[in-house]
């Protein structure tokens, strides 16, 4: 089986086969562009902070505020992670930090939203359990489809093709 199957671990066999067919037939770019024609405009740490804070205020009003949010180079990220959520205690106050892979700086907004929602869900649920995914779906009703499309986007990146990169 293709080494791209690792992106789709845990998915039903028919979904994995469809995804691998898209990859093998070089159709991932076409699929993504037809579904998500434009990249988002969140292209700085400040804009990411504003974007993530607005989602947090809308869905997680009672959770503590962010300390920081920013894009990080892959070398600065945990292996194979597109995003990380960390928190630290300062006295009695908990500070949350979000780090999103800089690969997502040039991606469609729904895929960025899926990743930010995923990291925000860790504010309440530390583990990837039913409650965690229920919270993700509360914040993004189409979360499961977005997560699958995000995995296709990652496969496209590993092929060296970002359909949304802004070439100069």
List where the protein language model places each region.
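Walker B catalytic acidic pair
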Residues: 119
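Active-site-proximal or metal-binding-adjacent scaffold patches in catalytic folds
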Residues: 1-113, 123-168
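Histidine-centered acyl-transfer/condensation active-site motif
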Residues: 116
């Amino acid at each position: 089986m293709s080494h791209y199957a690792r992106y789709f671990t845990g998915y039903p066999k028919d979904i994995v086969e469809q995804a691998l067919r898209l990859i093998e037939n070089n159709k991932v770019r076409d699929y993504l562009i037809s579904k998500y024609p434009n990249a988002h405009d969140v292209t700085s740490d400040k804009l990411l902070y504003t974007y993530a804070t607005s989602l947090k205020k809308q869905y997680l009003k009672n959770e503590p505020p962010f300390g920081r949010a920013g894009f990080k180079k892959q070398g600065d990220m945990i292996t194979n992670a597109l995003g990380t959520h960390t928190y630290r205690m300062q006295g009695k106050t908990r500070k949350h930090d979000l780090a999103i892979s800089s690969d997502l700086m040039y991606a469609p907004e729904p895929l960025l939203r899926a990743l930010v929602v995923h990291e925000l869900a860790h504010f309440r649920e530390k583990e990837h359990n039913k409650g965690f995914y229920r919270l993700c779906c509360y914040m993004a009703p189409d979360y499961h489809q977005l997560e699958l499309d995000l995995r296709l986007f990652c496969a496209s990146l590993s092929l060296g093709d970002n359909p949304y990169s802004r070439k100069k």
